[in-house]
Amino acid sequence: MSVILSNRLYLPYSPQLAEKIKAELTYTIPARRRGARPTVFKDFFKIRDTLSIPIGRQDFIPEGSELIDKRVDIPADIPEILYTLRPSQQEAVNLINDNYVINAIPGYGKTVTALALVSKLKQKTLIIVHTVALRDQWIREVQKILGIEPGIIGSGKYETDKDIVIANIQSLYKHSDDLKSKFGMVVTDECHHAPARTFKEVLDKLKSRYKLGLSGTLIRKDGRHVYMLDYITPFDIYVPQEENILKPEIVIFPTDFPISDSGLIPWANKITALTSIPNYNIIIKRIAEAEAKKGHKVLCVSDRIQFLEALGEGIANSLVVTGMYKERSDLERRLSDDIDIIFGSISIFKEGISLNALSCLILATPINNDAMLTQLIGRIQRKHEGKLNPIVIDLQYKGKTAKRQQASRLNLYYSKEYKIHTLNND
């Protein structure tokens, strides 16, 4: 019995194996709206007398099978890293010799660990990211950590001749057929995006011998995390012990601002109503300025651009970041010099911009997503010389919906063993 390993696994058909695969690779994703039907996703199909399943599900290979490995192995002259790894990073590099996922909170150093693995395995490598900001950040890290220039796919460039190529997924998608056999290793940054159609289809075409996923959270609010690792491996996941990070203190800030409990009003409209209250704007500004005066470097986040722009008005030592910022190094310099407060969009700061000096996170609009909240808190947990112990300002609102969301966030804080205290604003 022969099993082919390529972009996917190709196994000889048998009714018993087909039933087992159907049972395990049929995923029911609960509906997010009340009354809506769940989504059923199947990631297997039959081609004549062959069953095709994702490459990560090698647990379905029958014992005693002959393995025919058609994955591509493309040796490359990757230099040693110009960096000293911390113990848990070195542990990951020593451990990983095959498809793997590194699940570590922001501050661990997933980028340098991944590049150390690229150096170890010495394969022509494709690094996949989902934003231009992340792509540019990886370019700088490859230059700094390995001392070489990577190729770029995106922004009008299609440079596939370099030993390391960095591509944003939107540009990669249209070239996936051409690229499927050109890389011996693929690194997927923020691999929890893999269930997205473009990510999934690209990963499913690549025949790379080694696949490495990086993530700060393996949970998705939409429930699709149940199958996302099938394209890399759902079994070999490295979760390092927490090091090089600071545990934040959670400050619950009670307010009298209401959030409607009406099921007829869309959530987006409820948040728009909240951020349109003039006094709410004033309170957020005062909190940010007060924490900055204590010596904190403040990150105040929301998903409302106009709200963030309004918050930044009249505060001399602040900066509004709601889109791609030209250079992370410039942001770091300004935080050291003249900027104490950043009013930033959640979409930008949950992934992609890491500024070690940040020490205070203000949740300027409520968050009901544990994965997103974990990512945002990670932005203030990195160690940095002269940095105050990090704090999270979590505003408390009136209403049953607000209380349920607050309880969900508290559960996350307790699970992380964060110190929590509530201000008395009487």
Spans of model-derived segments:
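Interdomain "pre-motor" coupling segment immediately N-terminal to P-loop NTPase/helicase cores
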Residues: 22-71
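Conserved pre-motif I regulatory segment
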Residues: 67-103
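Walker A/P-loop
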Residues: 98-121, 126
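Conserved interdomain hinge at the start of the Helicase C-terminal
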Residues: 118, 262-303, 309-313
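Conserved helicase ATPase core of P-loop NTP-dependent helicases/translocases
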Residues: 136, 140, 149-161, 174, ...
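Conserved helix/coil segment N-terminal to the catalytic DExD/H
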Residues: 155-185, 196-201, 348
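Conserved RecA-like P-loop NTPase helicase motor core
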Residues: 173, 323-416
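Post-DEXD/H (motif II) to motif III coupling segment of the RecA-like Helicase ATP-binding lobe
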Residues: 184-185, 192-249, 413
